[in-house]
Regions:
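Conserved, charged catalytic cores of large soluble enzymes
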Residues: 7-29, 43-215, 252-262, 376-416, ...
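Short, mixed-charge aromatic SLiMs
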Residues: 144-148, 271, 310-315, 366, ...
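Basic, alpha-helical terminal appendages of large translation-related enzymes
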Residues: 2-16, 56, 60, 132-137, ...
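Short, charged/polar, low-complexity loop and linker segments
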Residues: 352-358, 410-418
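Generic structural concept
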Residues: 369, 373, 406, 410, ...
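Structured secondary-structure scaffolds
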Residues: 14-52, 56-59, 111-115, 160-385, ...
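Aromatic-residue-lined binding/catalytic grooves and analogous aromatic/hydrophobic interfacial grooves
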Residues: 388, 425-426
Length: 550
């Protein structure tokens, strides 16, 4: 099918929400930056599923390149064995963190190789690829030739480029410069190509170049890659290969029996989640130019969602400094969901943040254990104690404080939805936290434990508990895109899972829990994370108790 035919077909094919992440380089195990990106994308994917959209969430691994080949040689194993070992570590972490990806991209997959080679052949046939000899400086770490633009004020190549060597060799080039004027116009007029919007200037500045892109490496120094279909002495440059994963695993140019999605349902990607370090030139320059050369229109360009970095004491994480945070150790120490919560709560999408395990504990204990967890536990316990676990008639009693709580709950749903649609997860969670605080203030104001002592106040008591349970239910439902396990436990205790099964956030309205609804028994959803000092005090207390009993 031609691209034009696919465009026409797309207008009648139901669209899916297509969200991707950068594919992780398999030269070393995952760190906290990898985990943040995948959790952020997972939260957004779950949010769009909650909205009733059909979602396709793709993540994966980048398995080719010189660094992989060199590391495998040092270890005395094949590159395939090395990437298989590292890939297994990524897969295990994503399972542990509850990453709900629908597709998995690995660049050694034969389907990806076939797509890359078809694209290379098509580009060559269109005159977009040519061969020439070039002499210049080459970054072994970044696996690319450098220009004078990469030099610092002293005229040197900075430490971010690692070892830089002078090379002269023949290679294949992509006519990147053919697309400069188009890219400038496209990026300038586009409001949705790169988000947050402040990243747009960075892309525009990067478009100002006058050299083409080397897209091959001679097999004489790199054999671990996808062979050029028209020149078997060369393999494909790792970035050119890797970027194509966004279309290859979406079914682009795939064979009918490939078991890949239908491309016309997915493309263009609604959200490609990437780190700021790979915005330019890879995703902000190379990728749109490649797509344009392949025949994609302005309307068929993806949206890039660019996130910031987790720093340590203001410094970028680095193996050489020794400050890399292992997400597996975090999940083992605190649990997967506290880690998920922290990674999207303590950072603004698009900005940098400073990683702090003490803040992870503080945010979890304050916002989840003390606030939301305590609210749910108290509300369910009091309903069991005072109302035999049954929700009363909604028309029985009302007052101004209860009316105000209904208004703030509706506002919280609206704000949460707005922020999530804007990919601002931390702000969305802040809106929910504000409502939880309003509920806890409502409890202190109404004092249901005092109302229970006065038989004449029984209608008011039942009204208070009904309002608290409704807020717990709606809050517990919404937080499910961030904390799916905790959400399920809250709704289970409220016996409300079926009541929310066919709902979407835009259909939330007061009164989801019906009159006469019976809830289940409470159980702590967010047990506090204890400090070492608290653990020591508890152990000391337990020892004293045991001594007395002995």
């Amino acid at each position: 099918m031609t691209l034009l035919a696919k465009r026409k077909e797309r207008s009648i094919v139901p669209r899916m929400y297509y969200i991707t992440t950068a594919i992780d380089y398999t030269n070393g195990p995952p760190h906290i930056g990898h985990a943040y990106e995948k959790v952020l994308a997972d939260v957004l994917a779950r949010w769009h599923r909650m909205k009733g959209e059909e979602v396709y969430f793709l993540t994966g691994v980048d398995q080719h390149g010189q660094k992989v080949q060199q590391t495998a040689e040092k270890l005395g194993i094949t590159p395939q064995e090395h990437v298989d070992n590292i890939t297994a570590k990524f897969l295990a972490l994503w399972e542990r963190l509850g990453i709900s990806n629908d597709g998995w991209a690995s660049t050694t997959d034969p389907r990806h190789k076939a797509c890359v080679q078809k694209i290379l052949t098509n580009l060559k046939d269109r005159g977009q690829l040519y061969k020439k000899s070039y002499k210049g400086f080459y970054s072994v770490r970044q696996e690319q030739f450098l220009t004078d633009k990469e030099r610092d004020a002293e005229g040197s190549f900075g430490p971010e480029w690692g070892e830089v060597v002078e090379l002269e060799e023949e290679n294949w080039y992509f006519r990147l410069t053919d697309h400069v004027e188009w890219m400038k116009k496209f990026v300038e007029k586009s409001s949705g190509f790169v988000l947050p919007a402040f990243r747009k200037a960075e892309v525009l500045n990067a478009i100002d170049f006058d050299s083409d892109l080397c897209i091959s490496r001679p097999k004489s120094r790199l054999s671990w890659g996808i062979e050029l279909p028209f020149d078997p002495e060369f393999v494909t440059y790792v970035w050119f290969d890797a970027l194509i994963n966004y279309v290859s695993f979406a079914g682009y140019l795939a064979e009918p029996d490939s078991e890949l999605p239908e491309f016309s349902k997915l493309w263009p990607a609604d959200c490609e989640v990437i780190g700021k370090d790979i915005l330019v030139p890879a995703h902000g320059v190379y990728w749109p130019a490649m797509l344009h050369a392949m025949g994609f229109s302005d309307e068929e360009m993806p949206t890039l969602l660019v996130h910031g970095w987790w720093n340590i004491n203001g410094e970028k994480m680095s193996k050489s400094i020794g400050n890399v945070v292992d997400p597996n150790l975090l999940a083992e120490q605190f649990g997967p969901e506290p880690v998920r919560y922290y990674l999207v709560r303590d950072i603004t999408t698009g900005k940098d943040a400073n990683f702090d395990a003490d803040r992870l504990v503080m945010l979890y204990n304050t916002e989840l254990a003390n606030d939301l967890g305590n609210l749910c536990n108290r509300s369910i316990n009091m309903t069991r104690r005072y109302c035999d676990s049954v929700i009363s008639d909604a028309e029985e009693y009302d007052d101004e404080a209860s009316k105000a709580l209904r208004v703030t709950m509706d506002q919280a749903v609206t704000l949460f939805s707005k922020y999530m649609d804007d990919n601002m997860v931390s702000d969305a969670l802040a809106a929910l936290n504000a409502q939880v605080s309003a509920c806890n203030a409502y409890i202190e104001q109404q004092q249901p434990w005092q109302l229970a002592k006065d038989e004449a106040a029984a209608p008011r008591l039942r009204c208070v508990l009904r309002h608290l349970l409704e807020c717990c239910a709606q809050t517990g439902y919404l937080i499910g895109c961030v904390l799916p396990d905790a959400s399920a436990r809250i709704l289970d205790q409220l016996n409300a899972a079926d009541l929310f099964r066919d709902r979407t956030p835009d259909t939330l309205a007061w009164g989801i829990l019906p009159s006469g609804h019976r809830i289940n028994d409470p159980a702590p959803v967010f047990p506090r994370i204890l400090s070492e000092e608290e653990k020591a005090k508890l152990a000391e207390k337990a020892a004293r108790t045991a001594k007395k009993q002995g």
